[in-house]
Regions:
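Active-site nucleophile and cofactor-binding loops and adjacent substrate-binding regions
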Residues: 1-6, 24-25, 58, 103-104
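Thiamine diphosphate
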Residues: 1-21
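Gly/Ser/Thr-rich beta-alpha loop segments that engage phosphate groups in nucleotides
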Residues: 4, 12, 27-29, 33-35, ...
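A short, small-residue-rich loop immediately preceding and capping a beta-strand
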Residues: 17-32, 47-50
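Generic beta-sheet signal
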Residues: 18-20, 123-129, 223
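Cofactor-binding loop segments of dinucleotide-utilizing enzymes, especially the Rossmann-like FAD-
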Residues: 25, 52-54, 228
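Glycine-rich ThDP/TPP pyrophosphate-binding loop and its adjacent helix/strand module
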Residues: 32-47, 52, 56-201
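ATP/nucleoside-binding phosphotransfer catalytic cores, i.e., glycine-rich phosphate-binding loops
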Residues: 187-228
Length: 228
């Protein structure tokens, strides 16, 4: 528990020819294994990490995790958590990660896309998989993942494409001073020319940090390859 990154790092260092994939959860990767996790990213070890984030400890039966929402009720927080959650994307990019992507467990097409991109990446790749836990945290990502609302509450980023989203493809992301802003195309003189183009390969991590930090309801949640 928590040692997956240490083991996968050792395997890769011992046999660099191996294509190493690691599965871990929000609990073991960001709590008991957090030290191994951030230093593998910092060292840019050529491994592929899939972080399944269901915002709860599932294996150990329902304790709150580092990604549990503020106020979440669990076996170890019967009156609600008093801690604000980690954003895995911010953690990865803050540790100088060279690849970060995010997907939904229910979106097989997008998940396949980001895994293929991760496999091609030279260095440590981290994919955050937003998953449900039917037993201990059912509906963990319901507010953004349900098919009826997904198009308006998430944005799929692809390198070289404009940051446009919405069921009617009429919403976009613009720079607003030093931050980001959601706009409606066709209103207040806004056109597609005003919308940001995603550059996953930019050396400047600032925009990637802002994209990884976007949270509903103020912003759509960013999916796809954010940094590569």
């Amino acid at each position: 528990h928590g040692r997956a990154t240490a083991i996968s790092t050792g395997i890769k260092v011992a046999n660099p020819d191996l294509n190493v994939w690691q599965a871990c959860g929000d609990g073991d990767a960001l709590a008991i294994g957090g030290n191994h996790f951030i230093h593998a990213i910092r060292r840019n070890v050529d491994i592929n990490i899939i972080l399944f984030n269901n915002q709860i400890y599932g294996l150990t039966k329902g304790q709150y995790s580092p990604t549990s929402k503020f106020g979440a009720i669990s076996k170890t927080s019967p009156y609600g958590t008093v801690e604000h959650p980690f954003n895995p994307g911010s953690l990865v990019l803050g540790a100088k990660g060279t690849f970060f992507a995010r997907s939904l467990d229910s979106d097989l097409k997008l998940s396949s896309e980001v895994m293929l991109s991760a496999a091609k990446h030279d260095g440590c790749s981290v994919m955050e998989m937003l998953t449900n836990c039917v037993i201990f945290n059912d509906g963990a990502h319901k507010l953004i993942a349900d098919r009826e609302v997904r198009a308006d509450r998430t944005i799929v980023l692809r390198h070289g494409e404009k940051m446009i989203f919405g069921k009617d493809r009429n919403k976009g992301i613009m720079l607003d001073g030093m931050g980001l802003r959601v706009v409606t195309i066709g209103e207040n003189g806004i056109t597609e020319d005003d919308i940001l183009v995603h550059d996953a390969h930019s050396e400047n991590v600032g925009i990637h940090m802002m994209l990884a930090d976007m949270k509903y309801p103020d912003f759509p949640v960013a999916l796809g390859v954010i940094r590569d």
